[in-house]
Swiss-Prot record:
PANTHER family: 50S RIBOSOMAL PROTEIN L28 (PTHR39080), LARGE RIBOSOMAL SUBUNIT PROTEIN BL28A (PTHR39080:SF1). This is Large ribosomal subunit protein bL28c. It holds the Pfam family Ribosomal_L28. Keywords: Chloroplast, Plastid, Ribonucleoprotein, Ribosomal protein. GO terms for cellular component: chloroplast; ribonucleoprotein complex; ribosome. The gene is rpl28.
Amino acid sequence: MSRVCPLTLKKCNHAFRVTYSHKRNHRRQFVNLQKKRIFINNEWVVLKISTKAIKTLKSKTLKSKTFSNARLLHL
């Protein structure tokens, strides 16, 4: 399973690891994914979503425009 949030579609960010002598090496900054249990359609579903999506879910519902472009597979 790839490290992508299914609600916000966030992916990893490509950055540099910079040493004291300013040598730069490529590295990836991964999304902060957490397992979250959500009650949808009269059943509990466990999703691995980003912490940004968890904060948004606390303030809005899944029916919101925010998640209209999300790739929710079988919800």
